[in-house]
């Protein structure tokens, strides 16, 4: 009786083992890789189940030595295994990487969909094998600190997301061919942290989102530039302090841009003026734009000798300003007649705002957008209620009959009562404007 009871209890406790292998594999797939592998000691039934898990994260740092890492990988990346691999995150060290070719070859054969490979130690000698260039199942590819060789033939028919950081390209053609051979590519992100001398040419009929970041530790270093030809592009993020030029030849009229460019601002000659002229021409078609302080200063310098284009499409603007640029800001707004939403970020202390400069702003002619379209204004930097700051608040409340909401963050709650008194003294042009104090 007691034996029968014990057997019954044992069966109840091990009901999970009675589930079919495909269902057990799905359960293991919910666990971190190292936890899934631990189940191999439960019984003979469980010994190899983890090998069929479709999602894996493999890092050399989880193993006592390189040989243990290599043995584990060779066991999983068996090209004869019939199961598909949906996704893999692979973290490499600086050891010899000859194992990469058979591993990646096996992944391509097993229909990998999402691949992330990152080298965390060593230089850039780890070269991705040629089989990766012809993977017909790959949907997402993210590579970090690796080398890509030139391939005569590239075919990635399903790739939608491509992210490359600190990648060494054999030449400019390697990158250009890679991007242009992805017919359904929608998102591209590139991070460059040294001067590789390449012109990055992006030609894509399907690309919708593009992020490019480039920087250098050397003040005098520059790179040739970037050329983008992507007619469906609707979101562009640029954080580039080293490129001599950045050209976008085609884009959606409703595009959203986040721009941090300086074009080596300290060398402002005729050639640079021509580049900036082209830059302004293509951003004039943007609907939603975010501009950093360096880029705004660049536009200001250009306007001192050449007229600005009309930013007729722009309805939303997020701009960071130095105190010295604030006086010129209304002039920029005159080129944005249909602006509806404005977010102002201040670079530097509020004490740098000049009362005389703000007086000149308040006495300048009112831009068309303030009179006909501006509905939302938000100050991002906390304000103290100082004279020059209040003059800027006065400028929007006094001159915009269409304003619906003004958002002001206070630096100190102790000034709130005094700040309210100052606000009540400002005449409002709009009868519907709501003032929100944060």
Curated annotation (Swiss-Prot):
The keyword Repeat applies. It comes from the Eukaryota. LRR repeats lie at residues 135-166, 167-192, 235-261, 318-346. Residues 362-409 form the FBD domain. PROSITE patterns: FBOX. CDD domains: F-box_AtFBL13-like. It holds the Pfam family F-box. This is Putative F-box/FBD/LRR-repeat protein At2g05300. Keywords: Leucine-rich repeat, Repeat. The keyword Repeat applies. Residues 13-59 form the F-box domain.
């Amino acid at each position: 009786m007691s034996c029968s009871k014990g057997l019954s209890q044992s069966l109840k406790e091990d009901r999970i083992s009675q589930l079919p292998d495909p269902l057990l594999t799905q359960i293991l797939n919910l666990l971190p890789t190292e936890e899934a592998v631990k189940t191999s000691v439960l019984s003979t039934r469980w010994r190899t189940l983890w090998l069929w898990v479709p999602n894996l994260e493999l890092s050399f740092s989880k193993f006592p030595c390189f040989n243990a890492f290599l043995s584990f990988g060779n066991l999983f990346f068996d090209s004869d295994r019939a199961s598909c691999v949906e996704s893999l995150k692979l973290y490499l060290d600086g050891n010899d990487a000859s194992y990469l070719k058979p591993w990646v070859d096996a992944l391509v054969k097993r229909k990998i969909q999402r691949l992330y490979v990152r080298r965390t130690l060593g230089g850039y000698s780890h070269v991705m094998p040629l089989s990766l260039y012809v993977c017909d199942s790959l949907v997402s590819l993210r590579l970090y600190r690796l080398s890509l060789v030139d391939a005569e033939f590239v075919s990635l028919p399903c790739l939608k997301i491509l992210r490359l950081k600190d990648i060494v390209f054999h030449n400019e053609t390697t990158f250009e061919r890679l991007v242009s051979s992805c017919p359904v590519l929608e998102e591209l992100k590139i991070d460059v942290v040294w001067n590789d001398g390449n012109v990055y040419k992006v030609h894509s009929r399907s690309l919708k989102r593009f992020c490019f970041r480039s920087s250098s530790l050397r003040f005098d270093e520059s790179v040739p530039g970037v050329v983008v030809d992507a007619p469906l592009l609707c979101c562009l993020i640029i954080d580039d302090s080293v490129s001599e030029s950045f050209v976008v030849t085609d884009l959606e009229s409703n595009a959203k841009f986040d721009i941090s460019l300086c074009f080596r601002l300290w060398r402002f000659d005729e050639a640079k003026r021509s580049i900036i002229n082209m830059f302004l021409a293509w951003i004039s078609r943007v609907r939603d734009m975010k501009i950093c302080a360096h880029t705004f200063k660049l536009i200001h310098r250009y306007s001192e000798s050449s007229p600005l284009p009309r930013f007729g499409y722009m309805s939303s603007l997020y701009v960071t300003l130095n105190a010295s640029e604030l006086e010129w800001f209304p002039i920029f707004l005159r080129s944005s007649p249909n602006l509806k939403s404005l977010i102002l970020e201040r670079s530097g202390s509020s004490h740098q705002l000049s009362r005389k400069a703000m007086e000149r702003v308040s006495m300048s002619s009112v831009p068309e957008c303030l009179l006909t379209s501006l509905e939302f204004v938000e100050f991002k930097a906390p304000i103290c209620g100082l004279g020059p700051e209040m003059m800027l608040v006065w400028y929007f409340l006094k001159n915009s009959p269409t304003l619906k909401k003004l958002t002001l963050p206070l630096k100190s709650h102790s000034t709130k009562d005094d700040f309210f008194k100052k606000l009540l003294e400002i005449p409002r042009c709009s009868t519907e404007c709501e003032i929100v104090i944060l």
